[in-house]
Amino acid sequence: MVDRKEDQSTQFRDTSSGNFEQAAKTATQTQVDPSLADAQTVAQSLGVDLNTGLSQAEAKRRLDKYGPNELASAPPVPKWKKFLEQFKDPLVYLLLAATGISLVAWFIERANAVPGAEGGEALPFDAIVIVLILIVNAVLGYIQESKAEAAVEALSSMTAPQTNVLRDGKIERINTVDVVPGDIIVLGEGDSVSADGRLFAAASLRIAEASLTGESVPVGKKTDTLAQAKALGDRANMVFNGTSVTQGTGRAIVTSTGMGTQVGKIADLLQATEDDETPLQKEMNYVSKILGSAVCIIAVVVLVALALTEGFQDVHDVIDSLLLAVSLAVAAVPEGLAAILTVVLALGVQRMAMHNAIVKKLHSVETLGSASVICSDKTGTLTRNEMTVERVVTPSGEVQLTGTGYAPEGRMVVDPQTMEHAQIRGIIESEAVATLAVGALANDGELRESAASAGNAETVTWEAVGDPTEVSLIVAARKVKANRKYANYERVGEIPFTSERKRMSIVAQDNADAGRLTVFSKGAPDVLLGYCSRIAVGGAVRPLTEGDRQQILATVEQLSSDAYRTLGQAYRPLGTASLAQVPGIMLNSAGHVADIAEQSDVLENDLIWVGMIGIIDPPRTEVRDSVAEAHRAGIRTVMITGDHPLTAARIATDLGIIDKGGTAMTGSQLDELPDEAAFDKVTSGVSVYARVAPEHKLKIVESLQRQGNIVAMTGDGVNDAPAVKTADIGVAMGITGTEVTKQSAKMILADDNFSTIVAAVREGRGIFDNIRKFLRYLLSSNVGEVFTVFGGVMLAGFLGITPPGSQGVTVPLLATQLLWINLLTDAAPALAMGVDPSTDDVMARKPRKLTDRVIDAEMWGDIIFIGVIMAAVTLIGMDMHLDGGLFTDRSVDAIGHDAQMTEARTMGFTILVFAQMLNALASRSHLQSAFVGLFSNKWLWGAIALSMVLQLAVIYIPFLNTAFGTVPLSVGAWVECLGLAMIVLIASELRKCVLRAR
C-alpha cells in the first residue's frame, strides 16, 4: 500500500528555485481562449486528436518541455532566520547597543585593572542580564510564530493523485503530476479534476466548484462554445483543477497545467502576497523608535555637556560615561514589555478559543478589535452551504417548510389566511406532500445518518451524498413524511439530467399496486411545463390551460427574483406493469425494451404537473444579529462572492447588509473601472459583490485598506485565500474551510459561525484597552527612570550625588536596579492590568482609525507628567540622604560618600517601586479616579503585593544586596519612601480632576 503523504510529497516537488519561471512554463498552451473556441479548434491548437489522444512519446516530450503538473512552492524560511527575525525591533537594537557598550566598559576596566570601580565585576553582569532578556523574548516570539506558511502546499493537496487520460487510443490511469497540455482527461462521478480543460464530451456532467468560485451548487457542464467571455463560474464548457465531479461523465482537452491553472494563479497570488505588520506591531515599532530616539538625544546631550564642563581626564571618565549610556538605555527601554505583551495577547487567545475563535498570530488578537470592515464570503460563511427547500408552490396554494440544512427536522406552514379554511389547507398540504414525493423519487442523491456519542448524550449528524440540490429534496420529503408515499416504489429506469435537457425522469413500479409503472420527472419549470398537458388540482386531474401556464411562469419569475432555485415536479401513470406495453416504446432486436434513456420522447410527454419547489442556501440564523451588532460597533459588513448577483443581493438583504431593493456589483463591472480612484470610489459605498474572481476579492480588500480601513476578511474556499492573506486579519472557517484558507488566515473559526467574529471583536477591543493601560503604566516608569538618571547626572553637584571636588560621573541608579524595576516589580501589575475585564461600552464605540495612535498625544502627556513627578520625588528622596546636597551642607569624604550613595540609591530605588505600585492603580483609567472600582481587579492587588515582596527581598537578602547595590532600610526610611511616592498618586488625581472639569 502506498503511503498517501509520501505519494503527495512526491507529486508536489519544490520548483521554487527558478522563482516560478520554470513553473510558469506550464501556463495555458492554447493560442486561443478555449472557452470561446470550439473543441476542434482547441484540439488543433494543442496538436491532439480527440479520438486517440496524445501518443506516449509526445506526452513525454511535452512533460520535458512544460514541466510537471504541480504547483510551485516557495523555499521554507530557515529556522535560524526565523529566530533572528525576532530581534528586528528598534528597542532590541537599543538594548544590543547597551550590551555592547557595557561589554566595552567591562573590558576597558579589566584591562586597566581598576579595583573597586562600578562595573568591575568578574563577569559583565549587566551585559549578561540584558542578553538573557533578549533571548527569552526572542524564544517567546519564535514559539508563537514558528508555524511555517503552508498555503501553496495545501493548494497542491487539492489535486487528485491519479488521473484517467486517453493516450494512443486507450484510457490509462497515470500520476496527476504527469498530465500535460493536450492530454485528453476522462472524467467520471467522484473524480477530482487534475488540470484546467475544455470539454468536448459531457453526459449529465455536474461539477462542484464551490471552493474555487463560491457557487453553492454543482455546476451543470456542456460542450457548447461560449459567445462571449464570461466569469469563471459561468464557463460551462470548462473544467478546473481542484474541483470534483458529482454526477455524470465527460472528456476534456487539457489547456493548462500546474501554475497555469486557475488554482495555480491563486497560488501565485499567495506567493506575491507578503505578510504585513499588524496595526499593533506598527504602533509598538513607532513607540520603540520614539523611545530610542529620545534616549539617544538625551545621551548625546548629557555626554556633550559633561565633555564641555568636565572633560574626559582618564579611563575612569570613559568608563563612567559608558556606564551612563548603558543606564540611560536600560532606563528608557521597558525590557519586560515584549514578554508582558506576549503573555497578555496569549491570554486573550485562550479566551477567544473558549468562544471558538482560534488565533494563529498573537498580534492579530488586537487587530480584530480594530477592524472597521469585515469582508465575508457568502457560501459557507454567511450561509450554511446546505441547500434547503423553503417553499413549495402547488396549483391550490403555497406552503413554507421550516428547518434549515440537511437535518430532516421541520414542518409545513400554510398561509395564515388559508389556515382558517381547514378543507383548503388540507388540499394544499396534500399537494405539497405529493410534490415533494416526486422530487424525492426522481432523485440520485442520498442522505446519510450517523450517530456520535458526546458524554451521556448521542448526537446525530446528517451527510449529503451527491448533488446538494437533490439531497435537499430528500430532506424536505422526510420532513413532511412524504417518504410514505413512495416507500413501495422501485426504480426500473432513468432518463438522466443534462444541461441541454434541463430535466431528469425515472420510471418506477409500485409494488403495492401490481407493479404498475409511473414516470416521475423534475426539472426547470419552464422546460418541464412544455411536456405537461394536465395538472393535479384538489385531488383531481384536469387539462392544463394557458391560464395555468401563465400563472406558473409568473410564480417562477417571482421565486427567481427572490433568489430561489426552482424545480418543477410532474408525473405520468403508464397504466401498465410492463414497459413493453407502453404505446410507442421501442424494442431492441431481441424483443426487449430498448434503453429507456433514449426514449424520452415517449415517456416524457402528457405529464401531470403537481407543483414546484423553491430551494436556497439559507443564511445562518444567528448572522443577522451579528451583522446588526457589528453595525452598532461602527463595523461595516461587505459580502464578496462568486455566486449569482440575485442570490447575493437576496442573502445580503435578509442579513441586513444592504437595504431592500439593493443590488450587487459584478466582477465584470469592476473590470470596467478605469483606475484605482474609480475603484476606491465604488468600494467606499458598495457592500455586495457577486460573480467575482479571486483577483477581484484581493483588489477589493486592498482598496478598502487604501481608504484607511482595518480589514478583516472571512472565507472558506480556496478562492478566498489571497484576500484572506492580504487582509489585516484573515479569518477562515474551521469546519468547511479548505486547508489553504486556514493556512493563509490569522484566525480560524472552529464553529464556522460568523457570530463568533463579533465575540472576537469584543475581546480584541478589550485587549486594546488593556494594552493602553499597561503601556501608560510601564512607560511612565521608564520616563521616570530616564529623568531620574538625566536629572541626577545634570544636577549631581546640587543634589550631593557627586561630592564637591570629585571628577567623573556618578549615575543615580545602577543599571541592574533599573532592570529589576523593569523586569520584576513592574511586570506583575502590568500583567494584571492586561486581564482587566472589558467595559460595558466596548461595543458601543466606533472602531479606532488607522491613523489613531495606541499612545496618543494626551496619553504621552500623562506619561511624561507622571514620569517627571516620579523623577522629582526620587531625586528628592536621594538628596535627603546625601551630605552636600540641597537639604544639607555637611561635607563628607569619598569613603563616607560611597556609603551614603548606596543608601541613597536604595531609597531612590524603593521610591520608584512604591511610586509605580500607586501608579498602577491610577493607570487603569485616563479620567476616572483610581479610587473608583479600587478593588475590582483582585489580580492587580495580588501583583502589587508580589512586587512589594520582591522589593523587600532585594533589600534584605544579603547576596541580592551585593548584586543590586542595596542596603537594608530603617522603618523611618520606609515611611519616607511611601510618603514621597504618594505625591505621584496625588498629582495624578489632581490632573484627572482638571481633565474631568474640561
Question: Where in the sequence are the language-model features?
Answer:
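Conserved cytosolic headpiece of P-type ATPases
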Residues: V2-P847, V854-I855, V868, F909, ...
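Alpha-helical transmembrane segments of multi-pass integral membrane proteins
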Residues: A111, D862-G877
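Transmembrane alpha-helix/helix-exit interface in multi-pass inner-membrane proteins
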Residues: V302, G834, A871-D883
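Helix-coil boundary and interhelical linker segments in multi-pass alpha-helical membrane proteins
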Residues: M794-L814, M880-E903
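Generic alpha-helical transmembrane segments
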Residues: T825, R905-A920
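Membrane-water interface at loop-to-transmembrane-helix junctions
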Residues: L850-I869, I895-M907
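A C-terminal functional module that forms or caps the active site or interfaces directly
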Residues: S923
